């Protein structure tokens, strides 16, 4: 919706593609490793375990999830990444959703000694051999720092993302940080869960998504 409307934020989401989202959500529910009514009993650890042991075909996560699934039944050469297609014109030219919602910050109210120690540590992480090896090889992270040219992670998921970029696919923008509030997300999850369990309707999901967005945005920007 952001892409179609040429925006990067909004105070009132329209839910233009909610029908498409419903098809994907139904696909998930009808092809899960458990009954739809039982999805709330599953955890992220369950999902990682089921995928890495070959019990599930798909595992929705990012490149950072590699650490949780490596060295198990699924061989690295059998791992890849696939965009979540929802039936929108032109999406075949899109790649993966890329970005970050986490940042390194230094508390300006800390003591000068602590501030300097923190900056020194951050520099060590991105410039020292030990720090770069830790991020790239031990954790398998892809990083934006120019000091990592010789420390590209041996992570098949990172390589899969690079292949999409090499093929000229346009990355999908990272819009998680524009959600109006954590409460909006929690209410939407609750509506999706009730729909999955058969105690709620998709209309309730739409209400939580659209009306809830406007309400939470207004509350957060009073």
Feature-to-residue mapping (PLM):
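Short helix-initiation/N-cap motifs at beta->coil->alpha
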Residues: 38-53
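Alpha-to-beta junction loops
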Residues: 53-61
């Amino acid at each position: 919706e952001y892409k179609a409307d040429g925006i990067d934020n909004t105070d009132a989401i329209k839910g233009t593609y909610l029908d498409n989202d419903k098809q994907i959500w139904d696909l998930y529910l009808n092809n899960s490793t458990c009954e739809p009514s039982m999805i709330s009993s599953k955890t992220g650890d369950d999902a990682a375990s089921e995928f890495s042991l070959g019990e599930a075909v798909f595992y929705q996560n990012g490149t950072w999830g590699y650490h949780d699934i490596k060295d198990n039944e699924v061989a690295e050469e059998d791992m890849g990444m696939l965009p979540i297609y929802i039936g929108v014109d032109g999406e075949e030219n899109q790649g993966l959703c890329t970005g970050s919602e986490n940042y390194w910050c230094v508390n300006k109210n800390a003591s000068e000694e602590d501030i300097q120690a923190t900056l020194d540590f951050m520099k060590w992480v991105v410039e020292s051999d030990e720090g770069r090896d830790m991020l790239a090889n031990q954790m398998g992270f892809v990083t934006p720092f120019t000091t990592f040219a010789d420390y590209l992670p041996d992570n098949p998921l990172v390589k899969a993302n690079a292949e999409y970029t090499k093929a000229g696919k346009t990355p999908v923008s990272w819009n998680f940080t524009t959600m109006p509030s954590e409460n909006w997300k929690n209410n939407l999850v609750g509506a999706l869960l009730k729909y999955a369990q058969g105690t709620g309707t998709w209309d309730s999901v739409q209400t939580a998504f659209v009306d809830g967005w406007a309400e939470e945005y207004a509350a957060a920007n009073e």
